[in-house]
Curated annotation (Swiss-Prot):
This is Atrochrysone carboxyl ACP thioesterase AgnL7. Its EC number is 3.1.2.-. GO terms for biological process: secondary metabolite biosynthetic process. InterPro entries: LACTB2-like_MBL-fold, Metallo-B-lactamas, RibonucZ/Hydroxyglut_hydro, Sec-metab_biosynth-thioest, WH-like_DNA-bd_sf. It comes from Paecilomyces divaricatus. It catalyses: atrochrysone carboxyl-[ACP] + H2O = atrochrysone carboxylate + holo-[ACP] + H(+).
C-alpha cells in the first residue's frame, strides 16, 4: 500500500482509532520535560508540537553512550525542536552518525532538514523503510551499532506501510514508534496487518517501550495485550450490531458505516470526530471483518451497506 493508502486518516494526522483514544486526548496528560535522560543510553527530546493527536509532542530519541550517537525520528520541523537538539548535542559533546525515521508521517520526518543544516554529513545517514530519494533503506532484522547501543530493526506495518520499530538490545527495550503509544491507542491504515504487527512486537519479548508519543511504557507486554483486546472488542461490537439488525429486520438487513456508528457509539457525536476519526476507523474494522469472512457489503444506488454473514457466538 502506498502513502495514499487508506489515507486521510493518517495524511491529516486528524485521526484516531476509536473513542478510547479520543477520551485520552481530552484527559490530563502527564507533563514531560523538554529534554530527559530516560535511561543510561537514551535521551528523549520533545518535538515541541504538542496537540490533540500528538499528545505531549513527538518524542525524538538520542541513543548511545559515546560521542557519536544516533537519533530516532525528527519531529515536525519546528524551530524550537531544532534549537533543543542543537543545544543538547552541544552540551553533551555529541555528534549524530545516523538518523532513523520510524515512518513517513510529517510529525516524524520534517526535522530532517534542520539536522542536515547542523551537520551536512548527515545527508548520507538518513535511514527509512521505503526510503525517499537520497535516503538509505532499513530492512527487517537489520542491526545498527553505536557505542553503548545495539539497535535491531523490526518491520512493523499497520499504522503505516513503512513503519519500523527498533529493539535496543542492551536494555531489552523497544522503540515502538506510533504502533504503541504512551497513552491511548494508535490510528491504523490496515487493522488486520496492525494486529499481526502487535503480535510480532509481542514476540520480541521486550520489557519496556519507548513510544513516539507519550510517556515511557514500563510494562510493554501488558500494553500490547490491552491493545489487542481493545481492537478485538471493537470487532465484536460491530458484529453484534450487524447481527442484531439482521435478527430484527431480516436476513437482507444492512447498515451504512454512518448508521453502524450510530448503533455502536450513539448519535451525540462531534461531527469532526465522526468524519475524521470514527468513520475511517469503522470502515477499516469492516474491511478486516470482510477479509476474515464475517461480513460483506452490497452497493445499491451508489450507497454501500454492510451485513453479517454469520451469527455471532457469545
Amino acid at each position: 500500500m502506498g502513502e495514499g493508502g487508506y489515507q486521510q486518516i493518517n495524511k491529516t494526522l486528524n485521526a484516531c482509532a476509536f473513542d478510547d483514544y479520543l477520551a485520552t486526548q481530552h484527559a490530563r496528560l502527564p507533563p514531560l520535560p523538554d529534554v530527559e535522560q530516560i535511561s543510561p543510553r537514551v535521551v528523549r527530546v520533545l518535538g515541541q508540537n504538542a496537540g490533540k493527536f500528538t499528545l505531549q509532542g513527538t518524542n525524538t530519541y538520542i541513543v548511545g553512550t559515546g560521542s557519536r550517537r544516533l537519533i530516532i525520528d525528527t519531529a515536525q520541523g519546528y524551530r524550537a525542536w531544532a534549537d533543543l537538539i542543537e543545544s543538547t548535542l552541544a552540551q553533551r559533546s555529541i555528534r549524530l552518525s545516523h538518523v532513523f525515521l520510524t515512518h513517513w508521517h510529517g510529525d516524524h520526518t520534517k526535522g530532517v532538514p534542520d539536522l542536515i543544516r547542523m551537520d551536512p554529513d548527515l545527508a548520507e545517514g538518513i535511514y527509512k523503510n521505503s526510503p525517499d530519494h537520497g535516503q538509505r533503506p532499513i530492512e527487517d532484522g537489520q542491526v545498527f551499532r553505536v557505542e553503548g547501543a545495539t539497535l535491531r530493526a523490526v518491520h512493523a506495518p499497520g499504522h503505516s506501510h513503512d513503519h519500523m520499530c527498533f529493539v535496543l538490545e542492551e536494555e531489552n527495550a523497544l522503540f515502538t514508534g506510533d504502533n504503541v503509544l504512551g497513552h491511548g491507542t494508535s490510528a491504523v491504515e490496515d487493522l488486520g496487518l496492525y494486529m499481526t504487527t502487535l503480535r510480532k512486537l509481542q514476540a520480541q519479548e521486550c520489557a519496556v517501550g519507548y513510544p513516539a508519543h507519550g510517556a515511557v511504557i514500563p510494562n510493554l507486554p501488558g500494553k500490547i495485550t490491552n491493545e489487542l483486546a481493545q481492537k478485538t472488542r471493537r470487532e465484536k461490537q460491530c458484529l453484534v450490531a450487524l447481527d442484531r439488525i439482521r435478527n430484527d429486520q431480516g436476513r437482507l438487513a444492512s447498515l451504512t458505516v454512518s448508521e453502524l456508528i450510530d448503533v455502536v457509539h450513539g448519535t451525540q457525536l462531534d461531527e469532526q470526530v465522526r468524519k475524521m476519526a470514527l468513520e475511517p476507523f469503522m470502515d477499516e474494522v469492516l474491511r478486516k471483518l470482510a477479509e476474515d469472512g464475517h461480513v460483506a457489503f452490497r452497493v445499491r444506488k451508489g450507497v454501500k451497506t454492510w451485513f453479517a454473514l454469520n451469527t455471532v457466538r457469545s
